[in-house]
Amino acid sequence: MDAAVRQQARERMKGYCRVCPVCDGRACAGEVPGMGGLGTGSAFRANVEALKKVRLAMRCLHRAVQPNLACSVLGLDLALPVLAAPIGGVSFNMGGGPVTEADYADAIMLGCRDAGIIGCGGDGVGDVIHECAFESIRKAGGHGIPFIKPWDGEELNRKLDKAAATGCPVIGVDVDAAGLITLRRQGRPVSPKSPEDLADMAARVHGAGCKFMIKGVMTEDEARIAADAGVDAIVVSNHGGRVLDHTPGTAEVLPEIVKAVRGRVDVLADGGIRDGVDILKMLALGAQAVLVGRPFSTAAVGGGRDGVAAYIEDLRAGLTAAMTLTGCADISSVAPHILA
């Protein structure tokens, strides 16, 4: 990422994020609200450390010199297998300085659209968060995925219906936000959902003509529950280490989850992904695409729409190089055999 964008983000996010040279959760342990991990920060660090342990087998005797990064996930054609993760709450998570919630949402949605991928919109306390995300998706011509928190009662249904009205192709619920401390502190009712609740949500979203994905699956049994409930895609995620301390890293649990529901739902993953090499590792472990969170926040706060597009170009270049040096001609050829 451009040094000037990082420095601008560091100044604007002072007191909320240090924009460390290596974003591994060590300096910001316990800083929630903010951009850190909950408690000791162990789960945040586990995401980074789990990916760090994955090794790639370098191959240089092949014909894969111009790999094709394009893929299709949830029926969406993407220039590379990346989505910007749903993050909201600029004022209490990022500081942001002059960057408003609307500015942030526009930077993510429009920057991602410009680069041929898709951004996800956040939700939270205060209608401004989801309203700005919804409006940005509308500005992008429906090119975005709104995520809704697992609210209790009618609020969940109301927001699902409003999300569908943006013209989006997919709606998500980050079920792991049931443990988000920023919501608990503000007395907002979120809760875990039963299999029956999940099936009801899937039916409501499908009835609106959208596909349905959930974020926050960390076990094989819950992946099967999601598939049985009619969910179209799951994101293997521990919410960036922000909801439960001492969970494993997502890269540790991803392969078995993929094995449990292969062919039934699309499987995506997030957690500690910073560059193109990290993307390739997650794909080799079985993910069909990845969500990237904190670096997109840095890019959006520090550089706006152009900063987001430039960061995506960094990811594209890094993934191209990594695929070339592991002999992968296209995304479909990425498999566990490239792991050392």
Predicted feature residues:
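An N-cap/entry alpha-helix motif that binds or orients negatively charged groups
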Residues: 2-79, 334
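N-terminal functional module of multi-domain proteins
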Residues: 43-126, 130
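Active-site mouth loops of central-metabolism enzymes
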Residues: 85-101, 145-154, 210-218, 274
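Alpha/beta enzyme core
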Residues: 110, 139, 151-269, 276-299, ...
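Long, hydrophobic, well-ordered secondary-structure blocks that form the structural core
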Residues: 128-154
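C-terminal structured "cap/appendage" subdomains that terminate the fold
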Residues: 289, 297-300, 304-315
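Charged C-terminal helix
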Residues: 317-340
